[in-house]
Regions:
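Short, acidic/polar
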Residues: 112-124, 194-204, 288-295, 362-369
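Mid-to-C-terminal alpha-helical segments outside catalytic/metal-binding sites
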Residues: 395, 399-424
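Boundary/entry segment of secreted carbohydrate-active catalytic domains
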Residues: 73-116, 349
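Terminal targeting segments of Actinobacterial cell-envelope proteins
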Residues: 1-37
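Second-shell residues forming the walls of enzyme active-site clefts
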Residues: 99, 141-148, 243-401
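Hydrophobic faces of well-ordered beta-strands that scaffold small-molecule active sites
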Residues: 104-112, 128-132, 158-165, 212-216, ...
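Glycine-rich, aromatic-flanked loop segments that form ligand/cofactor-binding clefts
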Residues: 151-177, 197-221, 241-265
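C-terminal region of N-terminal signal peptides and the immediate post-cleavage residues
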Residues: 28-34, 49-83
Length: 424
């Protein structure tokens, strides 16, 4: 309901003064006497009008018992702005009871070996997400034990992620069957066929309890198939990548999974392999003309996540990997990449086994730096470091090295990712 401002009360319009001239009226007075009386009369009328206006605009409305919860029983004066209605109650109910350590644990996603490992890290440390890796025992996806863990009482449900791109990156091949690489799909199939492939595989993944697929890869490259990105890319031009990666993301989304675009801000033309060591992309000005276009086009179809890679970007990251750079997260969040400000969940790439990170950071420090920079979820591939990571993060919060506002910002993003109805 819009706020209404009081309408100014106009003084009564003056009618014809004295029908006829003074000599035609009985008991005519002098001009000066008439002027004094006229001024007094007008003043009196003004006082009366002002009094009426004050009474009218200060009188409260009768209480409308049909109003909804936000305004039940509240008498709102005409002309006063209405108090904004908060719609964040469900979100606060979900995250409010969490301790600081539990809040921090929600920002972690860790690889697990089997269901016992998963149970331990979830029940003992309250981590918000687990990652199904190539070495994970997949029986937990088939025997219902993962599903049991997901329905256990918790403030927020457990997120379960996987890297399932097709081609070289298939963690669930034994359960889903083989899928051609992204490059092969774009060369041999229509976009609609790719959509259906992703939807069919996504539906099976969802039935196993998976909630997130770190796919599609939206990097742009014409590099040989066996290079770091190579055939993981749908093509060497933005148009092809947008069409086919968009279809793949839509299929996953329609199957009930969260698709995650990667590797922001673009690994396709970077020099080197971030699994081994530092890599560098072209300057940001060049990335905007090609590598960032898929993010610009595909980030508007929701829900969708983004994974930030470990590349260094000249004139942007100041020698830091992108996943550790506040400038990169601002680029995404503020729309500096050329698209709308991104409001979905943002993940790091693996922080524990990729040379671009491990040469410079321990896992606890890498997690801390990435969360400080702007990541919502820090990803790595084993559970052993979880206690040390949480200890380090708690110390960082206590010393204000990691602000409570940053923790809450990331936590709200994670909560909405897990339950979109909590958005406010």
């Amino acid at each position: 309901m819009p706020a209404f401002a009081p309408v100014p009360v106009s003084a009564p319009a003056a009618g014809p003064v004295g029908v006829g001239t003074p000599e035609h009226r009985p008991d005519a007075r002098s001009d000066s006497t008439r002027s004094v009386l006229l001024i007094a009369a007008v003043a009196l009328l003004g006082v009366v009008a002002l009094t009426v206006a004050v009474v009218m605009f200060s009188k409260p409305r009768p209480v409308d018992t049909s109003e909804t919860a936000a305004g039940v029983g509240a008498a709102v004066p005409d002309g006063a702005p209405e108090t904004p209605v908060s719609t964040c109650g469900p979100l606060q109910a979900a995250i409010g009871p969490l301790t600081m350590r539990q809040k921090l644990a929600q920002l972690l996603m860790v690889g697990v070996t089997d269901i016992a490992d998963a149970r331990s890290v979830v029940r003992d440390h309250n981590v918000g997400g687990i990652f199904i890796a190539s070495w994970s025992d997949l029986s937990m996806l088939q025997d219902g034990s993962l599903r049991e863990l997901q329905v256990a009482p918790a403030a927020l449900p457990l997120a379960v992620s996987v890297d399932e791109e097709g081609g070289r990156v298939q963690r669930l091949k034994s359960l889903l069957g083989a899928q051609p690489s992204a490059r092969e799909l774009a060369q041999q199939s229509s976009a609609e066929q790719v959509y259906q492939i992703a939807k069919d595989r996504g539906t099976k993944m969802r039935s196993f309890g998976l909630t997130i697929d770190f796919a599609p890869d939206v990097d742009i490259t014409d590099a040989p198939d066996n290079t770091v990105i190579g055939d993981r890319s749908f093509g060497n031009d933005a148009t092809t990548v947008v069409e086919y990666a968009g279809a793949y993301a839509r299929g996953l989304r329609d199957a009930g999974l969260l698709p995650v675009l990667k590797h922001f801000p673009g690994h396709g033309r970077a020099t080197g392999d971030s699994h081994v060591g530092s890599v560098t992309t072209p300057p940001l000005s060049e990335l905007k003309t090609s590598d960032l276009i898929p993010y610009r086009e595909l980030s508007t179809a929701k829900p969708v996540g983004v994974m930030v890679g470990h590349m260094q970007v000249p004139d942007l990251t100041d020698g830091l990997p992108a996943s550790m750079s506040a400038a990169v997260y601002r680029l995404l969040r503020d729309g500096g990449y050329g698209g709308p400000p991104f409001t979905g969940p943002v993940f790091t790439d693996d922080l524990s086994s990729m040379g671009a990170i491990t040469q410079y950071y321990s896992v606890p420090e890498a997690v801390l730096v990435s969360l400080k920079a702007g990541a919502d979820v820090a990803l790595w591939v084993s559970t052993a470091e979880v206690p040390a990571v949480l200890d380090r993060l708690e110390l960082a919060v206590a010393s204000q090295e990691l602000t409570i506002d940053r923790v809450d910002e990331a936590l709200k993003s994670v909560a909405v990712m897990k339950n979109p109805q909590l958005a406010c």
